Curated annotation (Swiss-Prot):
This is Eukaryotic translation initiation factor 4 gamma 1. It comes from the Eukaryota. Residues 280-290, 324-340, 379-388, 547-563, 949-981, 989-1028 have a biased composition (Basic and acidic residues). Residues 602-621, 918-937 have a biased composition (Polar residues). Pfam families: MA3, MIF4G, W2. SUPFAM superfamilies: ARM repeat.
């Protein structure tokens, strides 16, 4: 560093003495105290620790001549041995143990006063940083003082400055004992003595130097200023030489010092002190008397006294004395000296090695004075000290100034200071005063600043080290290197490690090693200790880090994180709430652990937020997931439980009765608004008041609606609802609005026979309020709407427009698409009729009862121009409204104008006309003209009938209608056809039969039977044509939307369950004329009766069975409606535990005669319920009901075989046998000996089995169940079953009389056609089976023709199948083929004529 460092740095805690500092900041005196109880670690010569050596006797020390360099007092460190207070003077030890060090060859250093002598004494190995003391003496001291005065002498100093620095800037707190080492063998060195090795100073201050000669002589003190050493580069480049050990010489002969030794001393001084120190040492104060102010302890031996006396006699050279006197005259002091503090007594040095582990005999034998004796000073010494204090003169410059800077010798320059100069004062003003009452904790409360080196360091070698003042506690500096130890590293006796073979190379480390035996008090924290912290028993933990054990122990924080987590789950469920997800989410709510009163109330608040805050929303209040049966413990009494239902009702009651509280709040806000000072404040309060009123009104409205829904769920009684109505029936508009909402919700359930008087009173009061007109028109209209709703039997004008499920939306989209498709077809049909030209429709068919959009109908009115009132459609088709006997236009009740138009003059009677008017007014007015059939030839009529029927069969669109028409024919089919047929048709038909019989007079009786069969067949065709004339009515009814159909379905079901009129209900369903939407009727029928009585469910099942038997309801529609219920059955099980039993009661009647096959029904149920694991639940309930009605054996024989099909109903991995045994349905296993089982049967054997079943009078359902139970899937899918079933059915239809006849009733398509009849191959297979049967019967005359006619009329075999059989050349089917073709020639001729007529017509 630069030379701008303070000459001395005082240590504030040790500043003492009664002498005040001078104006220039210098300290007049330095107290050097040596205490008898202080433990010394060795004498320090010139800031160096003493060396241990062998024992010497006092006789070995010889007096020597005075030395020009005084010896500074040795410095001792406390903490060493307490007996070593007396100075130990080594004799030959200093010669043998100290004068051994490598000699370096430094560059010569120029000095102003000439080249001084540089002695090369042996450096002392250093254990710690060396304390540096600068002593400036003013006058000699008498020799007698050396022997009598104690060590503790406060000598006045003229320019005496002593500074002691410790490692890391820590100043010791105790005094050190200075010791003076002397030896008679040491010769006095030249005046400008230099140390060969000195420690690196820590602070920018001048340091005292001690010069030791090779010969044993008293130590000399160099009072020249000490500066910072040079860079380490010089030290690295220096070379070491073997040390020179001088021999003992007389005291008067100074030793000869070689130039190498002088250069070595200079180099070592430069390394330790710096170039600035060398410059200052030349300025003055180099040679002073060593005895001017250096006290010598009285306990020193006589040789030391002699040495001191000799030193007094030594005179300083004249040149140096003149320089000193000149400095005393010229130096006026530094202005900054005023800021210097009083130099305290010499502090002790920490971590100094003990003063020799082997004390010398001198130290052991000598008896030092005790501490009280230290205070005994001579009056002479005291006067000298006072005199020195009064006559202190300014010495050399303590600071190094630049040429252009202000300094005491150049006062005219500007006062400019650079950074380095100012940093030299950083530790001068450091005073630390402890606050009172604090405990003494040295590691926390600092007493001294940590003085780190301020010299420029090499950043590459000391990177990352803080060079500023470090106030960090000592325990935090565990990993940092000690930067304050600047002494050379310890090595061998020479004190320095060898640097390679030639002594070259970089240093190993900047940190010196501690000496052997040195005691260090290191305050450190052992990091490996297991420090136990205070741990709370129930410490708070975040919810994410809580373990299951913590939750089980109930370790919850104060804010109730468990309850908060429950509320979050409830809110999460409510956010996902939709009508479709309601049942699933309701199940989740019931699984929540709502076991405390707080949890119950919080869950209730969250659940009621939506219905209370949004009363006008379309979300129904009954879809609020509430665990009605949950119970929880109260807060005050844990043993008492509170029901969730009770909390819910109390909450609703409180909300209903809080009008007074709200009024008080509103009055208070109104008062604040009136008292508002500014208009802005008044406007703000007004908005707040309106908002509060709106919120309160919405909450009350939502509460009213919710109360009504609770009443519907039977959670509130009628008496409570009547009380609510009475309270709301007041004249304020808000209450009346709530009343209207409540009556709209519960009016239907509250208005029954017993409560009618009270309801009349309510509505009379409402009428009175309307008439008074004291309320607003809005409220009056609301009241009037409620009155109209009661008059319409609580049927709203608009249905509940609640939220729809995704499935409902999809269905509505499909229905809309279907309606658009129907409109397109109708437009295309109308366009085709217009393109034909002339009167619409074929001319030959005008006489037939075919009524369509064209023809004689009036011009159709589109839906867009005028809406259709569908409620009037039921009046048209009511029983009795359409009666063919009432449609009379002529006498006799006949529908021909023969008599009236033939000129007979007969007119219809008035009564007949009056009767006919109501009937004709509701029908097509031109239908009477179309009813008249002209008397034509029988052949032409027959051709027309065949042509019309074949044309219908030719198109695919007519196929479903034929199936529906065929299934609609009941047992009274012949009677209805006879009534609908005109007499002219009957006469023409009988005439045809007579002509045919005359043409074939020789034919046997069997042919006459066939003719009668043909007559019946023609009747069937006529009936089919008449029934085909009904589409105009169905077209009008097909326009019914899904919502309208659902409304009508509700009305039909309610009426049927109330009146139990099966015939009326079937007729109403038929009038709906929406076969593609009847699944809505099925769904609503099952859903509406699911929670009613068992009788209601049984009646609903019978109605659906009757609709299936009559053909009004298809199996596909029934399954579709059933599927929608089964999808929700699992969720319904939560609210309806016996839902599977109730579904079984609704489904079981379907499996009766003419309904759905049992096996097919079970398969369809399994498709949807097996994934849910609920198929077995419904199946077992159905089997139990069947056993009650039919018995176990009959159920088993009907085809229920769980032994083979039980895997479809059981869960995966469940044993079927164990399941059957557990559920006690062993009867379903059946008797394996009686049934052939599912094995391959031949055609003959299969036919015999089927004939056996048919002879028992089994129904179609029984036959199908037997097929499914006894045949494998491969046999069912093959033509073997088709031929066997055809053979068995046709054989059972033959009446074995003479001649053979055919029972047409047995040949119905629903018995023969086990599968789809539209497959041509199956139709040909049936004809082959019939051919084989006829061959077996030896070709009875006309039998095959009768079968062909019956099969054609019943639509069992299609026309294509007939042609395929005719043209077949299969060799396996040629037996009896020729005779069969001959017998049916007339049939094929007639069939081709019909097709030719149709082609000509088109």
């Amino acid at each position: 560093m630069s030379g701008a460092r303070t000459v001395s740095t005082p240590t504030p805690p040790q500043t003492g003495g009664g002498v005040e500092p001078q104006a220039n900041g210098e300290t007049p005196q330095v107290a050097v105290i040596v205490r008898s109880d202080d433990r010394s670690q060795g004498a320090i010569i010139g800031g160096r620790p003493g060396l241990p050596g062998p024992e010497h006797s006092p006789s070995e020390s010889q007096p020597s001549s005075p030395s020009p360099t005084p010896s500074p007092p040795p410095i001792l460190e406390p903490g060493s041995e307490p007996n070593l207070a007396v100075l130990s003077l080594p004799g030959d030890t200093m010669t043998s143990g100290m004068i051994q060090m490598p000699v370096e060859e430094p560059a010569p250093i120029s000095r102003e006063a000439g080249e001084p002598y540089c002695l090369s004494p042996e450096p002392t190995p250093l254990a710690e940083p060396i304390l540096e003391v600068e002593v400036t003496l003013s006058k000699p001291v008498p020799v007698s003082e050396f022997s009598s005065s104690p060590i503790q002498v406060l000598t006045p100093l003229a320019s005496h400055k002593m500074e002691i620095h410790e490692p890391n800037g820590v100043v010791p707190s105790e005094d050190l004992e200075p010791e003076v080492e002397s030896s008679p063998e040491l010769a006095p060195p030249p005046p400008p003595a230099c140390l060969s090795e000195s420690p690196v100073p820590i602070a920018p201050t001048t340091q005292p130097e001690e010069l030791l000669n090779g010969a044993p002589s008293p130590p000399a003190v160099d009072l020249s200023p000490v500066c910072e050493p040079e860079d380490q580069a010089k030290e690295d480049t220096a070379s070491a030489t073997p040390p020179a050990v001088p021999s003992a010489t007389p005291a008067t002969a100074p030793p000869a010092t070689s130039p190498a030794q002088e250069e070595e001393g200079e180099e070592e001084e430069e390394e330790e002190e710096g170039e600035a120190g060398a410059a200052e040492s030349d300025k003055g104060g180099e040679d002073l008397h060593p005895t001017e102010s250096t006290p010598v302890p009285g306990h020193l031996p006589q040789n030391v006294e002699a040495v001191a006396a000799t030193q007094v006699a030594v005179s300083v050279p004249k040149r140096r004395r003149k320089i000193k006197e000149l400095n005393k005259k010229e130096a006026v002091g530094d202005l900054l000296d005023a800021f210097k503090e009083v130099n305290p007594a010499v502090p002790e040095v920490e971590n100094q090695p003990p003063a020799g582990n082997n004390p010398t005999p001198e130290s052991e034998g000598s008896s030092g004075p005790s501490r009280p004796e230290e205070a005994d000073e001579t009056w002479d010494a005291k006067e000298d000290k006072i005199h020195n204090a009064e006559n202190i003169q300014p010495g050399e410059q303590k600071y190094e100034y630049k040429s252009d800077q202000w300094r005491p010798l150049n006062l005219e320059e500007k006062k400019r200071y650079d950074r380095e100069f100012l940093l030299g004062f950083q530790f001068i003003f450091c005073q630390y005063a402890e606050a009172g009452g604090l405990p003494h904790i040295s590691d926390v409360v600092l007493e001294k600043a940590n003085k780190t080196p301020l010299r420029p360091l090499d950043p590459s070698r000391l990177s990352g080290i803080n060079c500023g003042p470090d106030f960090t506690p000592s325990f935090a500096n565990l990993g940092r290197p000690a930067l304050s130890s600047r002494g050379p590293p310890r090595g061998g006796p020479g004190g320095e490690l060898p640097r390679g073979a030639a002594g070259l190379g970089p240093r190993r480390s900047l940190q010196p090693r501690p000496p052997k035996g040195a005691r260090k008090l290191i305050a450190s924290v052992i990091m490996t200790e297991d420090i136990k912290l205070n741990k709370a028993e129930k410490a708070w933990k975040p919810s994410s880090k809580r373990t299951a054990a913590d939750k089980d122990r109930g370790e919850e924080d104060a804010d109730g994180s468990k309850t908060q987590d429950l509320f979050r789950r409830v809110r999460s469920i409510l956010n996902k709430l939709t009508p479709q997800m309601f049942q699933q989410l309701m199940k989740q709510v019931t699984q929540l652990a709502i076991d405390t009163e707080g949890a119950s109330k919080g869950s209730l608040t969250s659940s009621l937020r939506r219905p209370f805050q949004n009363p006008t929303s379309q979300w129904p209040s009954q879809h609020v997931p509430l665990p009605h049966g949950a119970e929880s413990a109260t807060t005050e009494k844990p043993t008492v439980t509170v029901n969730f239902r009770k909390l819910l009702l109390n909450r609703c009651q409180k909300e209903f009765e809080k009008d007074k509280d709200d009024d008080e709040v509103f009055e208070k806000k109104q008062k604040e608004m009136d008292e508002a000072a500014t208009a802005e404040e008044r406007e703000r309060l007004k908005e707040e008041l309106e908002e509060a009123r709106d919120i309160a009104r919405r909450c009350s409205l939502g509460n009213i609606k919710f109360i009504g829904e609770l009443f519907k769920l039977k959670m509130l009684t009628e008496a409570i609802m009547h009380d609510c109505v009475v309270k709301l029936l007041r004249h304020d508009e808000e209450s009346l609005e709530f009343l209207c909402r409540l009556l709209t919700t519960i009016g239907k359930d509250l208005d029954f026979e017993k409560a009618k008087p009270r309801m009349d009173q309510y509505f009379n009061q409402m009428e009175k309020i309307i008439k008074e007109k004291k309320t607003s028109s809005r409220i009056r209209f609301m009241l009037q709407d409620v009155l109209d709703l009661r008059q319409s039997n609580w049927v709203p004008r608009r249905g509940d427009q609640g939220p729809k499920t995704i499935d409902q939306i999809h269905k509505e989209a499909e229905m809309e698409e279907h309606r658009e498709h129907i409109k397109v077809q109708q437009l295309m049909a109308k366009g085709s009729d217009k393109r034909r030209g002339g009167p619409p429709g074929p001319p030959i068919s005008r006489g037939l009862p075919l009524v369509d959009d064209g023809g004689w109908n009036t011009v159709p009115i589109s839906k867009g121009s005028r809406p259709i009132d569908t409620s009037r459609l039921t009046k048209i088709t009511k029983p009795g409204s359409i009666d063919s006997n009432n449609q009379l236009f002529a006498p006799g009740g006949r529908l021909s104008w023969g008599k009236g138009s033939s000129g007979s003059g007969a007119k219809p009677s008035d009564a007949a006309s009056e009767v006919s008017r109501p009937a004709t007014s509701t029908l097509n007015r031109f239908s009477a003209l179309q009813q008249a059939v002209p008397t034509e030839s029988t052949d032409n009529r027959r051709v027309v009938q065949r042509s019309s029927l074949s044309r219908e069969r030719g198109g695919k669109a007519g196929e479903p209608r034929r199936r529906l028409e065929r299934s609609e024919r009941g047992g009274d089919r012949g009677d209805r056809l006879d009534r609908a047929r005109t007499p002219a048709t009957k006469r023409s038909f009988s005439k045809e039969v007579e002509e045919r019989s005359r043409e074939r007079p020789s034919q046997p009786e069997g042919l006459r039977k066939a003719a009668s069969l043909t007559e019946d067949r023609d009747r069937g065709r006529d009936a089919a044509k008449r029934e085909a004339a009904l589409p105009p009515v169905s077209c009008a009814k097909a326009a019914l939307s899904e919502e309208e159909l659902e409304k009508k379905s509700k009305a039909i079901i309610e009426e049927y369950l109330h009146l139990n009129d099966m015939k009326e209900a079937v007729q109403c369903v038929q009038e709906l004329a929406s076969p593609s939407l009847l699944f809505i009727f099925v769904r609503h029928g099952i859903e509406s009766t699911l929670e009613r009585s068992a009788i209601a469910r049984e009646r609903m099942g019978q109605l659906l069975h009757q609709l299936l038997c009559a053909g009004h309801l298809s199996t596909a529609q029934y399954y579709q409606g059933l599927y929608e219920i089964l999808e929700l059955a699992e969720d319904m099980e939560i609210d309806i535990p016996h839902v599977w039993l109730y579904l079984a009661e609704l489904v079981t009647p379907i499996m009766q005669e003419g309904g759905v096959p049992m096996g097919e029904l079970f398969r369809e149920i399994t498709k949807h319920l097996r994934p849910l694991g609920k198929a077995a639940s419904l199946l077992l309930e159905i089997l139990r009901l069947l056993c009650k009605s039919k018995g176990p054996k009959k159920v088993a024989y009907c085809g229920v075989r769980l032994g083979s099909a039980g895997k479809n109903f059981c869960l995966e991995g469940q044993d079927v046998g164990a399941f059957i045994t557990e559920q006690k349905v062993e009867y379903t296993l059946g008797e394996e000996s009686e049934a052939p089982g599912q094995r391959a049967l031949s055609s003959e054997e299969l036919s015999r089995q089927l004939e056996k079943v048919l002879k028992e009078g089994s129904s179609n359902q029984r036959v199908f169940d037997w097929i499914e139970a006894n045949l494998s899937e491969q046999q069912i899918a093959s033509n073997t079953l088709v031929r066997a079933l055809m053979t068995a059915v046709c054989y059972s239809a033959i009446i074995f009389e003479t001649p053979l006849r055919v029972d047409v009733a047995v040949l119905k398509g629903d018995r023969i056609c086990y599968r789809n009849t539209c497959v041509i191959a199956e139709g040909a297979a049936r004809l082959y089976a019939l051919q084989a049967l006829v061959v077996t019967l030896e070709q009875p005359a006309n039998l095959l023709r009768m079968f062909f006619d019956a099969l054609y009329d019943e639509d069992v075999v299609k026309e294509e199948a007939f042609y395929s059989w005719e043209s077949s050349k299969d060799p396996a089917e040629q037996q009896g083929k020729g005779v069969a073709l001959k017998s049916v020639t007339a049939f094929f001729k007639w069939l081709r004529e019909v097709e030719e007529e149709e082609s000509d017509h088109n």
